[in-house]
Structures are given as structure tokens and as C-alpha cells.
Amino acid sequence: MAEAETHPPIGESQTEPAESGCPMRIKPPVEGGSNRDWWPNAVNLKILQKNPPAIDPSDEGYDSEAVKSLDVEAFQRDFDELLTNSQDWWPADFGHYGPLFVRMSWHAAGTYRVEDGRGGGGRGMQPFAPLNSWPDNVSLDKARRLLWPLKKKYGKQISWSDLIVYSGNRAMEHMGFKTAGFAFGRPDYWEPEEDIYWGAEAEWLGSQDRYAGANGDRTKLENPPXXPHMGLIYVNPEGPEGNPDYLAAAIDIRETFGRMAMNDIETAALIVGGHTFGKTHGATDIENGVEPEXXPLEQMGLGWANPGLGNDTVSSGLEVTWTQHPTKWDNSFLEILYSNEWELTKSPAGANQWKPKDNGWANSWPMAQGTGKTHPSMLTTDLSMRFDPIYGEITRRWLDHPEELAEEYAKAWFKLIHRDMGPVTRYLGPLVPKQTWLWQDIIPAGKQLSDADVATLKAAIADSGLSIQQLVNTAWKAAASYRSSDMRGGNGGRIRLQPQLGWEVNEPEELAPVIAKLEEIQAASDSGVSFADLVVLGGVVGLEKAIKAAGFDVAVPFTSGPRDALQEQTDVDSFAYLEPKGDGFRNFVAKGDSVPAEYRLIDRANLLGLSAPQMTVLIGGLRVLGANHGGSELGVLTDKVGQLTNDYFVNLTDMGTKWAPAPADDGTYVGTDRATGSPKWTASRVDLLFGSNSQLRALAEVYAEDDSKEKFVKDFVAAWTKVMNADRFDLEA
């Protein structure tokens, strides 16, 4: 009988090589290094396969029909009952969970940043790392557990994304506030989003990297992070770097909320309105335990364990109750703020906060639990709402006109929780308001064209004298402004409006004659075709010409739909954030951009919602179509420009070509004949990425194969159509 094997505990196994005094520790799989640990500068292609179907436990992905079947009235009744059903394991402050849910919703939606459209509450990221463990989200793990009975009961009729955001909205209604409405329709993702750059700091509440080189200028916060400290949704409530300077705090507030696409009125409304409810928690000096992501198994996903509960709860370390009625909507936040002079004090946990001078209002404020009394307190950032000249002018008016505060808060709150949802065509449910706002990027519903109309218009475009390059480029420029992060941009006819008309990437001088010709065709047609449809249809005509020239007969799909947005329906300042800093698909690099072009390409592909194969085939096709910015020959690896061939990949993978940096040292490369040394091609960093990166080269080789010529055309058409329809949420209905 063989001797039974013995094994050391997991993580402690060792191998002793023969005649070696240097044991090699074998790590368990969870501790193994990744490719990115070895090669941290490699492009991250994982972000091009976000939330893949393989990890989605639902049968067919997000079920909008199930959401539409939700009995909203019954659901609201159940939710309202939950609000005041205090649980011993996490008692409700003042007998009402409403303020906790407002904070949860606010902190979910408030991660949005307008710079790249990432963040927000639209994909249910708050339960996942890193957000679930941010210091600013202490105790929100409990808020989500309180909601579990509702989620369990209603299942796929309401996503976690919707439930988390809805909770704050309905809670405020239950506490007497009239909201502007609510839209369901947020899908759940099943893994953390790893394409969001939150900052470079390696410690919670760090700020040194995001202000590197700022020399004390708080407006020079690194982009795109929107908050001054790692792990904060907004600003440090104690003041910048913990310094209780409310005027300096106002600078941070304006910068941070501006990056959330909020103006001064919206910012003031959100702070004043939000702080009408509830309290902060810092009643003792006990320390929180570890965050949820690092907590021991037996805590079952909850974190920050400590003995404090009820009146002894500790979260932020600040102990502030703003009003006498923390579960009721009124104007008392401003009334208290302006009726007292304030002096600096410390919370029991040692945090900087403010109380009325001369011990005013002592023993007149409710405690979270029981009948005890305390005094009002304010955060440093609350005082910014009074003493900053701009915020002060706004809030002083609201002090005397509370109805205006209510109106502005309703609008700002609705914007906060819907900003990342995209167009109103994605809004579901009976609570959607009829009113629309400029920030929603409204595009009027369009007319469905008949097959005869489409054929007539295609013929007119084909006979217009516009080249394949002009047609393809214009369609790409219009559609490629789309970003899947907040579902903004895309077509809609805005390519001829400011600011897009003036973007460097769109080559205004080259664009003008194309716009004029398409408008001429539109005016001559009695079909009612929109300019937006003509732009896409022009791309179809150009592609089909290029496909035919390559010897194939492949139709390019087209579905008519959207009408044209008007200039007055376009927020120029907000749309300016959609301007690409680089577009590797057309070999465009913005002047002065310090980010390598290949990183910009991956980011652009990610924002377009493309997979790595789709990105690859589009690059190869656009190069041979001559679609480069400025007519550049970089990466145009064909002598048959305008034909949709796989020449790009054939020549890119040709070992008869030797590549070297161009003599000008301008980030471009020259390909020479390996035998003769004669120059053959020029290319960009983006182009060589598809020959040098192991994964992308594998894809390039597929399209370079002799039997892939037709596959290449069909795959290009499919990827092209995906980009053209990226903003067509009406097609998903």
C-alpha cells in the first residue's frame, strides 16, 4: 500500500530543487503574477471585452420587457414599508432609512465624470470593487443589504442598477420632496469596470499624484479623475487636505462638480438639498474595520466592522446633523446655516466640523436613536454654500424663495441620476417625465424611409461626385463621436453643428463641401430624409463601391430613423468633451497630446463598444479606403486605395519588410524591403501595434490569410454597421 501523501497548507508549498540550497516557493494561483505585472506598459485589450455573456447569469442578457412588466405601484408600497421597518442589525436613523438611501443613490450616480463619460450609476458598479470599498462609501454595504428582500422578491423586473438609484429618489418622495420623475432601464454588469482611471495614488485619501505639478493650484486636478482624493466621490468635507477653509473648499467643490457636468446652481442645489436629510456618523473615536473587499469570509461581504451602532455609529468620522427634521423636506438647512455664526470644533472621532458660536441651539437637535438631544453642526463644505461669493448669492435667494430651491434641486437630482443613461429613448417606466432638458442631447424621432426612397437617394449620392473617401470619412466622423460610457454622441446630424463642425479631427475645410452636397440632395428629395440618415447612407454608398471594386458583392445594411438635432438642441460646452484627442482609426493625433497613439486607439475602440477583432478589421479597412486624417499615407499599405481588400494585413505581416523609426523621430515608421533596402511603406505607432502586439498580430494574421478576403469584407461591414448604429437605441426596442 502506497504511503499517503501529505500536503502543506495552501500558499505554503515549496519545491527544493536537487542539490540546491535555494528553495522556490510555489504560489497558489490567486497570488500568481499577471502579464500586466511583467509588462505594465502593454496595451490593455481586456477592456475591449467588458461584461462578456459568459459571466452573465441571466438567460438572454438585460430583459427590458421584464422591467416594463414591473407593477410600479406595488413595488413602491413595498419600498415605502421597508423605509420605516428598522432592523436591529442596522437600525434606521430617526426611524427612517430614507437619508441612507439618498446617500447611496447619490454616491452611485455621483462617480460620473463628463470628461470621458465613465462612472455613474448606470451599470450597477457600486457593489463591486473598488467602489464598494471606497472610504466615502462606508456603510453603504448595509444600505444595499437592506434592499435585498425587495430585489429578491422582484427579481429581473428591477436591476440592482435601477434599485440603487431609485431608492434615493423614492426615499425623498416619502420624506415630502417632489422629484422630477424617474426612469428605469439601467442594466446590471457582472464584473467591475476596469477601464476607469480613478487616479494613481496607492493609498486611500491620497492626493499627491493627481495634483502633481499643480504648485498648490486646486483647479489643476489631473484629468479625468474628478475628486481631490482617492476614494472620495466628491470633496473632502473637512476642507482641502483636511484644512477647514470653507473658501478653499469652494474651489474644490466647483472643480469636482463641474467635472460631473454640474454648474454652480446645480451644485448648490445638490449640496443644500441632499444635506436637508439625515446625518453623518462620527459619534466615537473607535476605528472602522477593514473595507468589504478585504473583510474576512464570515462577514459575508460586509465591511468596516466596529462595535458602534445606532447613536455610536462611525462612518466618516464626522458627527453632523443638519436640521431638526432630518427625515422631512423643508428649507431648514439654509435657515440654520444663515441664522447662526459658526465656530470650528472637533467631532468625537477627531474630525473638523462646525457648531454654532456661544453654544447656540444646545440640546435642541434630535439624536439618531432615542430621545436624547444634541446641537446642530455643519461641514466645512456646508459653510462654502454661504461664504463663497457665487454660492452665497445663490443660496441667499433660496433662503427667501424655498420654492426655487425645490425646483432647482428636483432638476439637478434628476440630472445627477440620469446623466449617464444616454438618450430618452432608453428611459423605461411610467415615472418618466414629459419634460426634456438640453443635457439629454435630444434628437427628434425620424421618418422611416421606404426601400424605393433609399434606392433613389443612394443613386443621387452615387452620382453626386463625392468620392469614396469623402463619403466614408464623413460617415465615420459623425458616428465615431459616440461613446458607450454615457451613450452620448454618434450621429443625429450634429456633424454640421457646433462644436463638432469645428473639431480638428473632423477637418472642417474638407467637411464643408460634403455637407453642402448632402444638403443639396436632401433639399431635392421629397422623401423627408434627414441629414443624419444621408450621412450614414453616404457611407453605405462609398463602402459598396469599394466592395464592388474589390470584386465582391456584399450589401451594407442601412436602417433609417433619426431626424436632425438643431443647434439650439445642442449644448456646445457639454458636447466639447466628446472631441477625440486621438482617432487611431484615421491615424489622427491631436496637437500636443502626450498619450501614445496606441493607447488612444484602445480607449476610442472601448468607447465605441468594439471588440478587439472589430477594432482590428476596421483599422485594416479604413486604411485601404484612404480614410486617414489629412490624406496621410501612414499605414495605407496597398496600391489599390479605395478597394476594400485585405492588403493592409497582407503587407503588415510580410516578413520581407523591415520596419524602423523614421529619421524625423516624429513617432512614425518606415518599412523597407529587407533585401534591397528600398522604402516601401510608412506607418504610425497604431499600425505597428497590429504587427507587434501578440494578440493583435494573431488577429491580423487571420485577415491576412489567402482564404480570408471575403471574410474580411463581411467582418468589416458588420463592424462598420455596429459603429453607424451605436447610438440607435430605438433599434433595440
Swiss-Prot record:
There is a cross-link at W106-Y234 (Tryptophyl-tyrosyl-methioninium (Trp-Tyr) (with M-260)). It catalyses: H2O2 + AH2 = A + 2 H2O; 2 H2O2 = O2 + 2 H2O. Binds 1 heme b (iron(II)-protoporphyrin IX) group per dimer. The record marks R103 as: Transition state stabilizer. The active site is at H107 (proton acceptor). Heme binds at H275. One of its GO terms (biological process) is cellular response to hydrogen peroxide. HAMAP family: Catal_peroxid. Homodimer or homotetramer. There is a cross-link at Y234-M260 (Tryptophyl-tyrosyl-methioninium (Tyr-Met) (with W-106)). It comes from Mycolicibacterium fortuitum. This is Catalase-peroxidase 2. Its EC number is 1.11.1.21. GO terms for molecular function: catalase activity; heme binding; metal ion binding. Keywords: Heme, Hydrogen peroxide, Iron, Metal-binding, Oxidoreductase, Peroxidase. PANTHER family: CATALASE-PEROXIDASE (PTHR30555:SF0), HYDROPEROXIDASE I, BIFUNCTIONAL CATALASE-PEROXIDASE (PTHR30555). Its cofactor is heme b. Residues 1-35 are annotated as: Disordered. Belongs to the peroxidase family. Peroxidase/catalase subfamily. Formation of the three residue Trp-Tyr-Met cross-link is important for the catalase, but not the peroxidase activity of the enzyme. InterPro entries: Catalase_peroxidase (IPR000763), Haem_peroxidase (IPR002016), Haem_peroxidase_sf (IPR010255), Peroxidases_AS (IPR019794), Peroxidases_heam-ligand_BS (IPR019793). NCBIfam families: cat_per_HPI, PRK15061.1. SUPFAM superfamilies: Heme-dependent peroxidases. Bifunctional enzyme with both catalase and broad-spectrum peroxidase activity. May play a role in the intracellular survival of mycobacteria. One of its GO terms (cellular component) is cytosol.
